[in-house]
């Protein structure tokens, strides 16, 4: 499928400033594009969102009344009107490229015109604490399955199937990887540095996790110890269970980090332990907001014991709520993470009106 090009708006920060600036840890800028066809109901819906680390800062929705790229973070609002005009033009052009790509891919897979189909793309770059390039990436999917991805060398592609190999040959002939690499190593990094500087009051803050442990009897012989980390930012965190100092990786139940709804994140990790041996187990928490890793141990006198029956009842209700949230998140994700094919052939510009996404001539799938 056509690679959705993040607009190549090149932003020339002062090189000296950029390379002398220091930030805690690594940082990322990522764009997610999604196009969903809807036969009989007009043009496909196109949604694009941009993130710096775990903070959404821009959004475009072809179904929105404004039909414009819109700010989602206070620090991006300071950009000039030309920036927003350029971003909007790029998104509208991208949506049209995706419309064509949806038809092309339907042909590749010999699909009828009746069903709805989805194209998604994620691309972006990471920088280190010194502001220098660490890595770049682009991944495309069709109908929820991998389609084609840029390899770590930023010079070659991995196609998921025969249809994707057609796209791969087209992009290789058009030197798509070379142009994309120039964006990822140059424009993407420069804009990320700019955003980190402009949004430093929020983007560079950290919230240490609030931690506690709960105890859930399963039977007369076993109990579950659950280690909780709540209200932390950024999202990256490590929870590790140990027994007598040895990692219990294989025996740990671990959930993915989840948004808490207030800009922070939450996570838990659990182990099943023999009753009476709880003191042999420790939970270790590592996070950027902590001065040093935390070690938690079950203290029966100060922490709650929750019967597993009560938990199951609670989880039934909680699960229903989460199920609805997951469905909504998946739908949003598919809309927001779609990237059409874009050829990164347009020369980079220093005009800040262009923006930080890829805005190159579209190279279709």
Swiss-Prot record:
The record's SUPFAM superfamilies line, in alphabetical order, gives:
Immunoglobulin, MHC antigen-recognition domain
Membrane topology type: Single-pass type I membrane protein
Q: What is its main location?
A: membrane
Q: Does the keyword Phosphoprotein apply?
A: yes
- Provide the positions where the record notes the PTM Phosphoserine: 343, 345, 349-350, 352, 356, 359
How does this protein assemble?
Heterodimer of an alpha chain and a beta chain (beta-2-microglobulin).
* Stated name of the protein: Class I histocompatibility antigen, Gogo-A*0401 alpha chain
Q: Which organism is it from?
A: Gorilla gorilla gorilla
């Amino acid at each position: 499928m056509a690679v959705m090009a993040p607009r190549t708006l090149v932003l020339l920060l002062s090189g000296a400033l950029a390379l002398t600036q220091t930030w805690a840890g690594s940082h990322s800028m990522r764009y997610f594009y999604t196009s969903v066809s809807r036969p009989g109901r007009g043009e496909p819906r196109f949604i694009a969102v941009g993130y710096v680390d775990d903070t959404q800062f821009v959004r475009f929705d072809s179904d929105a009344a404004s039909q414009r790229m819109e700010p989602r973070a206070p620090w991006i609002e300071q950009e000039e009107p030309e920036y927003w005009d350029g971003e909007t033009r790029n998104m509208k052009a991208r949506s049209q490229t995706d419309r064509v790509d949806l038809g092309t891919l339907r042909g590749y897979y010999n699909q009828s015109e009746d069903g709805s189909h989805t194209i998604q793309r994620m691309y972006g770059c990471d920088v280190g604490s010194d502001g220098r390039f660490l890595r770049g990436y682009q991944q495309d999917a069709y109908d929820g399955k991998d389609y084609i991805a840029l390899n770590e060398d930023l010079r070659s592609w991995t196609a998921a199937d025969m249809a994707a190999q057609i796209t791969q040959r087209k992009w290789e002939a058009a030197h798509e990887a070379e142009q994309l690499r120039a964006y990822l190593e140059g424009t993407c990094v420069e804009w990320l540095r700019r955003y980190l500087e402009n949004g430093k009051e929020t983007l560079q803050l950290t919230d240490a996790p609030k931690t506690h442990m709960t105890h859930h009897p399963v039977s007369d012989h076993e109990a579950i110890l659950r280690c909780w980390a709540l209200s932390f930012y950024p999202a990256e965190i490590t929870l590790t269970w140990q027994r007598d100092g040895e990692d219990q990786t294989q025996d740990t139940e671990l959930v993915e980090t989840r948004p808490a709804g207030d800009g922070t994140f939450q996570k838990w990790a659990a182990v099943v332990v023999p009753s009476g041996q709880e003191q042999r187990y420790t939970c270790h928490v590592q996070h950027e907001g902590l001065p040093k890793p935390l070690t938690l141990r079950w203290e029966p006198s100060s922490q709650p014991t929750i019967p597993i029956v009560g938990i199951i009842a609670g989880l039934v209700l909680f699960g229903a709520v989460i199920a609805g949230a997951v469905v909504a998140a998946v739908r949003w994700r598919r809309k927001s993470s779609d990237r059409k094919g874009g050829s990164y052939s347009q020369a980079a510009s220093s005009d800040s009106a262009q923006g930080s996404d890829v805005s190159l001539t579209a190279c279709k799938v």
